Structure formats: structure tokens, C-alpha cells
């Protein structure tokens, strides 16, 4: 018996040793292959404006292309100083320096090391004084370098030296408006007296509110939220007449299920200061719920995503077993049947959130998902935390459902800011099925990145806007061989899996133009050369008499030929193709109704996709329908994916330097962000006018602003160049004689072009009787000059607008910026 006991003890000890040894081996293996995303470590930098904290800046791990760093705008104090506060978190701040650059980054005006750093509560403080001369009313870039430990981290803001900006009045108004809305208190009438409620406003949703919403709606209805992260105002645009501010913050509230929920809120304010008070010109509020799987998120027909202002997207496998969706910086995967809900990726930190968590200058794009739940996705933009913290680029990940793990396959480092990078990746970002190649469009170039050897091949460069389209889900890329938007007769389609090209051509009296992709099927249009109108730059018309949907085998899947009208463009949203159409009249082309084409493989939206339900406190909520019936009270099994390294591999990393822009582009910034890009100034001004925004050129020079013009203006005609006085509107001749950039503003309104008169530049305008020169204006009239005459005359504003519109709103002026 004793021998048996001894033998049992020995066996137990051997087994324990074996288990211990195995666990050590497994533990070591996991340590080698499993990674936990590091918490955010970069400091935040704020501007201290007379005791008010504004313009929160997020750090970059490398120097960025300053042309793309158009975020906040900081007004200099009277002595040309910017006071900053650095929130170090766990960092030791050893030094701070700053550099002042021209708006395009081509000139460095000064580079200074701060000799004395201060301390205020939990912040490190520094005074950044601009010592060298800079122009007034001109924007510059301030690049701040903060050394935290052994790392140099870069922060960017625009600066301006200008008087009478009323900055503090705008800040006081915006923060006061926010507080009264949050507290539900409008006893002094501040809210009711500044908003413009009307019948068209949607007062049934908290997801999006604006200046036309009711006061009760702006005060959050029945939700009664509490502040979790208070807003730090960000100045986006600022001049003598108007200001644009944005505020990001987080609130918590108890919803209809009596569970605590969290929301990320963004508010946009456009204001004017007049008669000693601030006037609210425009206001918008977007609210997005931070998805919490611990709450009651399963409902009878799917997943409750809550309040969402953003256009959400989802992807599912062909069997509709797996549903993937991204929300507020996190990617989730839901498996029907098992009710497993996996957090595949998230930038949100564990524990208490801070401003780094809600910095949403990034985007998650789901490329594909298979019948086993395996997925490929991209992370594009600013990396809030992790090994790429502070970098701006594209990370390519794969998710393995069997092991609940993600693997980084490729990281593409760029110097392009998120606003531009996201538009490039939206056009094309595709990884091959065998995971050996990644295809990307970036700044007009098409790249093939070999993941196995980290090589980058630029397949095409200098592609013009409107001359190429891509499909990230279908793995296709199409481009006009001639690279001319209005004069190309060959459209090539490449299958990125096989590398095979298919060419689509037209008759000699026709031209082609790509529209987009529906999954992997290419949509393009055909126009007759005789119908194409390119006479007025910026108002070109490419009237397509037919639209074709084709596959990579060259087969025509559908032909669309509208009766009595033409297609001038289109857009694809999932499987829905929307076509913009015009009719031909004696005066040219006029807009008519849109038409829609639905792909034959479109999902049955009755069972799948997004739906909206009403509730008492939260009003309208989004549901992702999953095609199943879920019992009330069902809770999901929540899993969290781990990040692992591929066995024996490191993720490929490549860097693509900033490209020199060869195409003249105009950037429209509106409501605090990049709105759109155009190749013509007239299109850009029309869009900015509609969106209450601004236009900048390739050099980031401000080229047009909505609402920033003098009340009255009369120019000295003796200073007008002779070529302007001659009244000739020939663009080439004007460019040659002026030696400046000539702006063709055809299609813009009179009110829009008066901005240039206010800036001191005359405008040529066509009328039925010939050309006149706009030399000034007042509240009721334009001041006009006929070529060859020496005296100006007044003409009513409304009559002038009608006269110019009858002649096609044809205006020409030139850009005459202040020189250093």
C-alpha cells in the first residue's frame, strides 16, 4: 500500500511538472506571438487664450506635410505670442521648440527653442513668441516640437496676426450655448433668441440637430445627459466678420432600458459679431453612441446600435451568418445562431476615456468577410495608440475567427493627413486573396505593394481627378488611358487578382468617362463629342447618352439609355447607383430628376440591413437587422480579439513620401473639415458658398471665404492693369499680361465674386451688351466701369445679379495675395 501511495505521489508530481513546463512553454509562445495594444502615451497640447483652454493638438511621431495640416487656427496675442499648456500624462517633458512656416511649408521664418518651461497644476506651460516679422491677415503654420523622454513629437496649428477678431466673444457664446443646452436651462432666452426653428427640421432624432431644430430638442429632449468629458473649443476659421468653431465632448445618460450609456458629441458653430453681440449664423450637432456590449444590445430582429448620426456600413458573408460593423473607433463581429459578439479592434482605452480616445481622425474599412467569419479590414488615418501611435497611414489587418485574433499584415506610413488620406483609400485599398499584394491609390498615383518583400511599385502616376476609379471590395481598378476627363476614348479595367486588363473603347465621335463600381462591376458612360461642352472651365458638361455596367470579362451586364435627357455623373452607395441627369435646352443643359439602378444581387432589406425604431428618451435608434428572430432578454457571448504576429513573420512596413502636386486643386473646407476637392476654382467656390466654407489652393493660401467681405467697397480704377481695363476675358492673354493666377469664376453668383472686389481685385463680367468691370459695391448697388471709359456708374444689386445671370454668370478675376 505504501509503495502504491508513493507511486501515485510520484505520478502526480511528474504530471504537475509536465503541466508547469507545458504552461511555461505555452506562456512563452503566447508572449512571443500575442500583443496587447499599448495605451495612448503621447501628450496633448492646448492653447491658453487668456485663461481659456482651446485648440487641443494631437501629436505626430514624425514631421508631416504641412500642406495637409489644416486643423485649428490660433490668433496671436498683441505681442505675437502663443501660450501653450502640455498635458504630459506619464511623460517627462524635457524641451519645447517651435518653427513658423509659410502656409505651404516652403519657407521657414523662424525656429526657436523655448528656454524656460513652467508648471501649472498638471500641465507644463510654455510661451511661444513670434519674433520675426510676419504679414497681418495672413495664415502661417506653427510647428511645435515637444521632447517627451527620448521621443520628439510634433504638433501643428495655423496662426494669424490680426486685430478685431472678437475671439473671446465667440468662445464665450459657444461655451454658454453648450452649457445651457446640457443643463436644459434657457431662462434668459439665449437659445430661443438665437436659433431659427422651422417646420422642415426633424425633431424626432437626437442623432443630428441644427439651427432649425426646436429649443426643446437642442436641450436634449427627455435624455437629461451629464458631462463626462467637457468640450475644448477648436477654432477652425476666424476673420474680422465671422468665426467657425467646433467642440467635441462626451456625455452619459440613462436610456430607455435604464442602463448608463455614453455618447460622443460634435458641435459646429458659425457666428458673426455685430452691434456688440454674437449672432449665430449656423449650428449643427452630431451625436454618436459609443457601443457597449454589456448593455441590452440584442433586440428581436438584430443589434441595437443606438443613436448614430453617421452613415453606418456593415458587411456580411454570403450566407448572412456573420455581420461586421464599425462604430466609434471599434470594429465588431456578430455571429448569428451562437450570438457571439467579438470586439475585433478598438482604439478606445481601458478605463477612463480622455481626449485621445474620441479623436476620430481615422476610419475603419471592412474589405471582406468569408463564410467562416474571417475578415480583412483597413485602419486608415491617425493612429491613436499602439505601436504606430502618432503616425498617419494605412494598416491592413486580417481576423482569424477560429483563434479570435487579428494580425497586422502591412503598415503604409504616409505624410498625408487623414482628411486627404481617407479620400484616397476610399477610392482603392485592396489586399489580394493570397495576402501577398496590397493596392492603393494615393495623391494621384496607383501603387502595388508587395507584402512579402516590402517593395513598392508605382504602377501609374499623375492620374487626373475624374480619370480613375477603384473597387476595394471587388478588387478592380479602372483608368482612362489618355488621362483626360473630357477627351478619352479608352477605359482600361484591371483585375487585381489576375493582373489582367480589359479595354473598353468607343466610336471616334464618342468619349468615355468612368462613374464607379457596384462591387466588382464597372459603371461608365458614353457621350457624343458634339454634345460635350468644355468652353467654360469649371462648368464643363459631359452629357452621357448611355451608361453601361460591365464585368472584367468585357461582358455588358446592363445598358441604360435615358429618353430625352443625359447623365452627367453618378454615385454608388453599396448596391444602389444614383445617376444625375440633365435636359438639353436652347440655353444649354438644365438639371432634371435623378434616376436609380439597383444591382440585381441587392439584399432583401426587409430582413437585413439598417432599420430605425422609436423610443421615449432616445427618440430614434438604429438597428442592424441580422435576419433572425432573437428572444427577448438574450445576451450575447462577448469575446475580445487578441493581436498576434504571424508565425515567424513581421508585418510588412513601407513608407510612401509626399508627392509633389502636379494638378492644380482647390480644397473646400466647411464646418471644420475638408469637404471636397475640385480642379476648377468656380466649382470650389460654388460648393464653399453652399456649405458656408472657404477655399484654399495647393499652397494652402486662402483663395475665397464665405461672408468675409466689407459692407461697401470702391476700388481706385487708376490702379487697374491695362489688360483689365481693356475688358478682354481671354484667360491665356490675361495670364500672360498680369503674371498672376487668373480665376475663371463662371457659374458663381454675383455675391460670391464680390469677395474679390472686397479684397481689392476688379472682376470682369459678361453682359448681353458686352463686358463690364466690377469696380466696387455698396449695400444697394454695384459700381461698374465700361472698358474704354473713365467714369464708373452705379447699378442696382438685384438688377446686376439678373443681368449677369442672363449672360451665364461669366466672371473672371485674378488672385493677388500679399507677398512676403
Regions found by a protein language model. Give the residues of each.
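Extended, charge-rich low-complexity regions and/or helical-solenoid scaffolds
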Residues: 490-492, 502-536, 540-575, 580-582, ...
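Short loop/turn segments that connect beta-strands within beta-propeller blades
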Residues: 336-339, 401-402, 450-454, 495-499, ...
Amino acid at each position: 500500500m505504501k509503495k502504491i501511495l508513493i507511486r501515485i505521489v510520484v505520478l502526480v508530481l511528474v504530471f504537475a511538472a509536465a503541466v508547469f513546463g507545458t504552461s511555461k512553454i505555452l506562456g512563452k509562445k503566447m508572449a512571443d506571438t500575442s500583443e496587447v495594444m499599448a495605451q495612448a502615451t503621447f501628450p496633448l497640447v492646448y492653447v491658453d487664450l487668456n485663461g481659456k483652454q482651446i485648440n487641443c493638438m494631437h501629436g505626430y511621431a514624425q514631421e508631416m506635410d504641412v500642406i495637409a495640416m489644416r486643423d485649428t487656427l490660433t490668433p496671436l496675442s498683441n505681442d505675437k505670442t502663443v501660450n501653450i499648456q502640455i498635458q504630459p500624462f506619464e511623460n517627462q517633458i524635457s524641451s519645447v521648440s517651435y518653427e513658423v512656416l509659410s502656409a505651404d511649408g516652403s519657407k521657414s521664418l523662424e525656429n526657436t527653442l523655448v528656454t524656460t518651461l513652467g508648471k501649472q497644476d498638471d500641465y507644463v506651460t510654455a510661451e511661444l513668441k513670434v519674433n520675426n516679422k510676419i504679414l497681418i491677415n495672413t495664415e502661417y503654420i506653427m510647428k511645435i516640437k515637444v521632447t517627451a523622454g527620448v521621443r520628439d513629437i510634433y504638433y501643428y496649428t495655423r496662426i494669424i496676426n490680426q486685430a478685431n477678431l472678437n475671439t473671446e466673444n465667440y468662445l464665450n457664446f459657444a461655451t454658454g450655448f453648450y452649457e445651457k443646452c446640457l443643463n436644459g436651462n434657457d431662462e434668459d432666452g439665449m437659445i430661443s433668441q438665437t436659433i431659427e426653428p422651422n417646420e422642415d427640421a426633424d425633431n424626432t432624432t437626437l442623432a443630428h440637430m441644427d439651427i432649425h431644430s426646436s429649443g426643446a430638442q437642442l436641450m436634449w429632449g427627455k435624455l437629461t445627459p451629464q458631462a463626462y468629458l467637457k468640450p475644448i473649443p477648436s477654432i477652425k476659421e476666424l476673420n474680422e466678420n465671422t468665426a467657425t468653431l467646433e467642440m467635441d465632448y462626451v456625455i452619459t445618460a440613462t436610456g430607455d432600458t435604464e442602463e448608463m450609456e455614453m455618447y460622443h458629441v460634435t458641435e459646429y458653430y458659425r457666428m458673426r459679431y455685430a452691434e456688440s453681440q454674437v449672432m449665430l449664423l449656423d449650428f449643427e450637432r452630431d451625436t454618436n453612441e459609443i457601443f457597449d456590449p454589456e448593455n441590452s444590445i440584442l433586440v428581436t430582429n438584430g443589434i441595437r446600435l443606438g443613436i448614430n448620426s453617421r452613415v453606418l456600413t456593415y458587411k456580411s458573408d454570403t450566407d448572412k451568418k456573420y455581420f461586421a460593423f464599425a462604430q466609434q473607433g471599434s470594429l465588431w463581429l456578430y455571429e448569428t445562431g451562437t450570438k457571439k459578439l467579438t470586439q475585433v479592434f478598438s482604439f478606445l482605452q481601458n478605463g477612463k476615456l480622455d481626449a485621445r480616445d474620441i479623436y476620430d481622425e481615422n476610419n475603419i474599412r471592412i474589405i471582406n468577410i468569408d463564410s467562416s467569419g474571417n475578415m480583412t479590414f483597413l485602419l486608415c488615418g491617425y493612429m491613436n495608440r499602439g505601436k504606430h501611435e502618432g503616425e498617419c497611414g494605412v494598416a491592413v489587418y486580417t481576423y482569424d475567427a477560429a483563434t479570435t485574433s487579428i494580425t497586422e499584415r502591412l503598415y503604409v506610413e504616409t505624410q498625408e493627413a487623414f482628411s486627404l488620406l481617407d479620400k484616397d483609400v476610399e477610392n482603392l485599398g485592396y489586399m489580394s486573396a493570397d495576402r501577398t499584394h496590397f493596392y492603393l491609390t494615393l495623391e494621384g498615383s496607383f501603387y502595388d505593394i508587395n507584402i512579402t518583400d516590402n517593395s513598392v511599385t508605382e504602377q501609374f502616376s499623375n492620374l487626373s481627378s475624374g480619370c480613375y476609379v477603384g473597387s476595394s471590395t471587388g478588387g478592380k481598378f479602372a483608368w482612362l488611358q489618355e488621362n483626360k476627363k473630357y477627351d478619352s476614348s479608352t477605359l482600361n479595367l484591371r483585375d487585381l487578382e489576375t493582373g489582367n486588363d480589359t479595354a473598353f473603347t468607343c466610336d471616334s465621335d464618342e468619349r468615355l468617362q468612368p462613374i464607379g463600381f457596384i462591387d466588382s462591376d464597372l459603371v461608365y458612360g458614353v457621350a457624343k463629342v458634339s454634345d460635350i461642352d468644355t468652353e467654360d472651365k469649371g462648368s464643363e458638361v459631359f452629357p452621357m447618352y448611355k451608361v453601361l455596367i460591365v464585368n472584367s470579362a468585357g461582358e455588358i451586364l446592363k445598358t441604360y439609355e435615358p429618353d430625352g435627357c443625359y447623365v452627367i455623373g453618378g454615385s454608388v452607395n453599396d448596391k444602389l447607383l444614383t445617376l444625375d441627369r440633365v435636359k438639353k435646352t436652347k440655353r444649354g443643359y438644365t438639371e432634371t430628376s435623378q434616376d436609380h439602378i439597383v444591382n440585381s444581387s441587392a439584399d432583401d432589406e426587409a430582413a437585413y440591413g439598417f432599420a430605425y425604431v422609436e423610443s421615449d428618451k432616445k427618440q430614434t435608434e438604429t438597428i442592424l437587422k441580422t435576419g433572425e428572430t432573437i428572444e427577448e432578454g438574450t445576451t450575447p457571448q462577448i469575446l475580445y480579439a487578441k493581436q498576434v504576429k504571424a508565425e515567424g513573420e513581421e508585418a510588412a512596413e513601407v513608407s510612401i513620401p509626399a508627392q509633389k502636386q502636379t494638378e492644380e486643386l482647390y480644397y473646400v473646407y466647411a464646418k471644420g473639415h475638408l469637404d471636397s476637392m475640385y480642379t476648377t476654382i468656380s466649382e470650389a467656390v460654388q460648393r464653399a458658398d453652399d456649405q458656408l466654407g472657404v477655399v484654399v489652393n495647393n499652397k494652402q493660401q486662402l483663395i475665397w471665404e464665405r461672408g468675409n467681405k466689407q459692407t461697401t467697397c470702391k476700388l481706385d480704377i487708376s490702379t487697374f492693369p491695362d489688360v483689365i481695363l481693356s475688358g478682354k476675358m481671354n484667360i491665356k492673354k490675361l495670364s500672360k499680361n498680369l503674371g498672376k493666377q487668373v480665376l475663371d469664376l463662371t457659374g458663381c453668383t454675383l455675391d460670391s465674386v464680390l469677395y474679390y472686389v472686397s479684397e481689392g481685385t476688379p472682376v470682369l463680367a459678361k453682359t448681353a451688351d458686352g463686358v463690364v468691370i466690377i469696380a466696387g459695391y455698396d449695400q444697394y448697388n454695384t459700381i461698374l466701369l465700361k472698358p474704354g471709359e473713365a467714369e464708373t456708374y452705379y447699378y442696382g444689386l438685384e438688377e446686376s445679379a439678373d443681368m449677369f445671370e442672363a449672360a451665364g454668370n461669366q466672371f473672371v478675376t485674378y488672385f493677388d495675395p500679399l507677398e512676403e
